[in-house]
Amino acid sequence: MSPQTETKASVGFKAGVKDYKLTYYTPDYQTKDTDILAAFRVTPQPGVPPEEAGAAVAAESSTGTWTTVWTDGLTSLDRYKGRCYRIERVIGEKDQYIAYVAYPLDLFEEGSVTNMFTSIVGNVFGFKALRALRLEDLRIPTAYIKTFQGPPHGIQVERDKLNKYGRPLLGCTIKPKLGLSAKNYGRAVYECLRGGLDFTKDDENVNSQPFMRWRDRFLFCAEAIYKSQAETGEIKGHYLNATAGTCEEMMKRAIFARELGVPIVMHDYLTGGFTANTSLAHYCRDNGLLLHIHRAMHAVIDRQKNHGMHFRVLAKALRLSGGDHIHAGTVVGKLEGEREITLGFVDLLRDDFVEQDRSRGIYFTQDWVSLPGVLPVASGGIHVWHMPALTEIFGDDSVLQFGGGTLGHPWGNAPGAVANRVALEACVQARNEGRDLAREGNEIIRQACKWSPELAAACEVWKEIRFEFKPVDTLDPDGN
């Protein structure tokens, strides 16, 4: 290197380590409509000021590294850096803070949840200066949303395809989840659909194991769908799980499902990955398939209150990546889910515009512009006695999915489906007549039992079943 070059390059550069907050903590910053905004729950190590911790998150998830480097001078850090623009103490929690970070839109590839998450929830989550870090919420700007296709079809198009209106849809996960032969599996699908369900579902564990290869399962399930449709006059579906070990194999399964003429396929979007999910969602839109999404592995990421990522962020990411249904908890069943938090991300899945509401854990106003909505699926430990509460909590635009609550009926699978359909129809009728489902729910179900022996038998079996455990992930005392 010539002396002239060396002198020019060294202007304004000082080697060494400097505090993150000198560059990345900018409390006077005015956020832009095009910024991606993030709310992080930060627990700094002892001795680390919250401003330095928040700035470190902004730096390590955008342009920063642990030391100053020569190549900082070859770009405009002010244009590309993330900025921690506000810090709030979490009431009732020692050494926890909410750090708000703004990211310039140019940091992210268009239409790529994978790239967005690689930056925002990447290596920064292992940063030693932080004891724990959790991403509570994201504000996705409309300019970025418009680079995504989103759900293959959305709520209204799905209802039109199925010709089903004015009530929640009913589903059932086939059990036992593993071990059935393809023929016996198809028989269970047929019995449930014939009994009155709209959908049946592959368990998320079911891919293509030695006891039941995927092609055999697809064929027997298609036969069950067509037979039940012919007998009931209703459009039916089974969530055929296309999740596989490679994207190529996944697409092969989706293509075969389309060739069979079935209405819907399924994907495990977290274990399968966002790149695979987005590819499948694009295929489903182009070929008229609905796409059901299971969230297997979500609790590894979202259940602990101080570290990881809240499910509302995963729900937003799914709406961008693409899916027509996604499992969203039940509030009343066996799986984690506080009511206000659950309703918050259910609205983020379905609605076009959601206002900031800290009482429901929503940190930012979110405008989805023209992106279609996603049906939330309530599934896990629910039965006929839960039907009034589920109908009242989730409303019409939802899927209520009873696995054991259908297949565990003492008279068999079809009577289990009948019991659920009768319970749902009774709740919808009562609601439409102006009755209070929250207060009168049990009485509504008891009255329906008088003209449905199948429902009466189901009510007797599950009359004592409760899952009364306090959720781990709860709102903070101030509504955070």
Swiss-Prot record:
Compartment annotation: Plastid, Chloroplast
Site (Transition state stabilizer): K334
Residues at which substrate binds: N123, T173, K177, R295, H327, S379
Positions of the propeptide removed during maturation: 1-2
GO terms for cellular component: chloroplast
EC number of this enzyme: 4.1.1.39
GO molecular function: magnesium ion binding; monooxygenase activity; ribulose-bisphosphate carboxylase activity
PTM annotation, UniProt: The disulfide bond which can form in the large chain dimeric partners within the hexadecamer appears to be associated with oxidative stress and protein turnover.
PANTHER family recorded: RIBULOSE BISPHOSPHATE CARBOXYLASE (PTHR42704), RIBULOSE BISPHOSPHATE CARBOXYLASE LARGE CHAIN (PTHR42704:SF15)
Quaternary state and interactors: Heterohexadecamer of 8 large chains and 8 small chains; disulfide-linked. The disulfide link is formed within the large subunit homodimers.
Family annotation (HAMAP family): RuBisCO_L_type1 (MF_01338)
Protein name per UniProt: Ribulose bisphosphate carboxylase large chain
Organism: Ipomoea purpurea (Common morning glory)
Protein's gene: rbcL
